Amino acid sequence: MTNDIKEIQTIQPGLSEIKEIKGELANVKKRKRRSKKINKLTDGQIRINHVSSEKKRRELERAIFDELVAVVPDLQPQESRSELIIYLKSLSYLSWLYERNEKLRKQIIAKHEAKTGSSSSSDPVQEQNGNIRDLVPKELIWELGDGQSGQ
């Protein structure tokens, strides 16, 4: 029976050992805690900085929209403009540009074929012989990505 008591004592720490472990854990916790970050700005200064940053962001956004309005023919500077209207009219204009670009490329190819008397593949952009690519400069070839269509 005394062996059983000794085994229990070795398995279970005594009260003094528990207090010692708790003290060590408390010291570890104290070392891990960080002091609260001290903000050098007052609440008023923080608010003023936030307001001025937001104002700069809005001004930049307005300037970009103004540039877009100047470029897209359907948008007039004097009309009231919502972002949605600007996006939709810009998308419509870009689609028109893609279609127009494709028509012009086909006209160039047709004129070339009429001059040379040869016919090219159905998709001149994909043609590998180089003749069509020489006719139409690379910067003039616009292609819509997969899943996109010119409305």
Swiss-Prot record:
Residues 116-131 have a biased composition (Polar residues). Residues 45-97 form the bHLH domain. Transcriptional activator of phospholipid synthetic genes (such as INO1, CHO1/PSS, CHO2/PEM1, OPI3/PEM2, etc.). CDD domains: bHLH_scINO4_like. It comes from Saccharomyces cerevisiae (strain ATCC 204508 / S288c) (Baker's yeast). It is found in: Nucleus. Efficient DNA binding requires dimerization with another bHLH protein. GO terms for molecular function: DNA binding; protein dimerization activity. GO terms for cellular component: nucleus; RNA polymerase II transcription regulator complex. The lineage of its organism: Eukaryota, Fungi, Dikarya, Ascomycota, Saccharomycotina. This is Protein INO4.
